Amino acid sequence: MAGGDNNSQTTNGGSGHEQRAMEEGRKQEEFAADGQGCGLAFSVPFIQKIIAEIFGTYFLIFAGCGAVTINQSKNGQITFPGVAIVWGLAVMVMVYAVGHISGAHFNPAVTLAFATCRRFPWRQVPAYAAAQMLGATLAAGTLRLMFGGRHEHFPGTLPAGSDVQSLVLEFIITFYLMFVISGVATDNRAIGELAGLAVGATILLNVLIAGPISGASMNPARSLGPAMIGGEYRSIWVYIVGPVAGAVAGAWAYNIIRFTNKPLREITKSGSFLKSMNRMNSST
């Protein structure tokens, strides 16, 4: 009997070790699936995010810079407001297309700003930025091939006035953009389904405001991609420093006023409108 008890205890102990090992294995798989693993072992979901960022940035830059190039080559047939609308719509549709996969950053400044606020893992920042740069460069290269490589139709961004003026303007409009993104995409009290519409509308407004002065980049990849293809690096630092500083400041500004993580319904339980809605739901 004693031998039988020892055997059963050994068996139970072995199964316990196996269960713990299986649990640890599942945790490691989940850890890697979230892209949090160390080293170069990228998980399939993380690779999917990178591909989504490449495609999203490509189509965004292709549509926006394509509108700029066509407007230049066809004597302004699209018009400046038309170009602004194209940029806004391009951002909106791509947010809805791949936002649920990668978060739809399409912008190294946005990725970096999220990381500084601990809303994006730092170790994924280089891969995201590289994907965004690749997408933007490929899009600019495609436009260069389509329009015969003519330098007079440069779809990049150049200051119309002084570098300081464009720097300040890029800081302000990127601050505005990142503030909106933080509100609609990271706050659980916001209506997430409207994120694409809100961000696209913000892009449209910013292009209308700053387009004639700085080109309304708001995105280092948007400026660096065409600059590398066209070989035009004049004042490129403006479109790196301004958007990065503006995005980080905008993200932190919203982070400061984010006083709670509770949903809106829990915060405003005393509101008469929500009370009436609750009564209607309970009565039905």
UniProtKB/Swiss-Prot annotation:
Residues 1-28 are annotated as: Disordered. It comes from the Eukaryota. Induction: By abscisic acid (ABA). GO terms for cellular component: membrane. A motif (NPA 2) lies at residues 219-221. The chain crosses the membrane at residues 50-70, 78-98, 129-149, 166-186, 194-214, 236-256. Residues 1-12 have a biased composition (Polar residues). It is found in: Membrane. The keyword Transmembrane applies. A motif (NPA 1) lies at residues 107-109. Expressed in leaves and at lower levels in roots and anthers. Keywords: Membrane, Repeat, Transmembrane, Transmembrane helix, Transport. One of its GO terms (molecular function) is channel activity. The keyword Transferase does not apply. Residues 17-28 have a biased composition (Basic and acidic residues). PANTHER family: AQUAPORIN NIP1-1-RELATED (PTHR45724:SF13), AQUAPORIN NIP2-1 (PTHR45724). Aquaporins contain two tandem repeats each containing three membrane-spanning domains and a pore-forming loop with the signature motif Asn-Pro-Ala (NPA). Belongs to the MIP/aquaporin (TC 1.A.8) family. NIP (TC 1.A.8.12) subfamily. NCBIfam families: MIP. Aquaporins facilitate the transport of water and small neutral solutes across cell membranes. This is Aquaporin NIP1-1. It comes from Oryza sativa subsp. japonica.
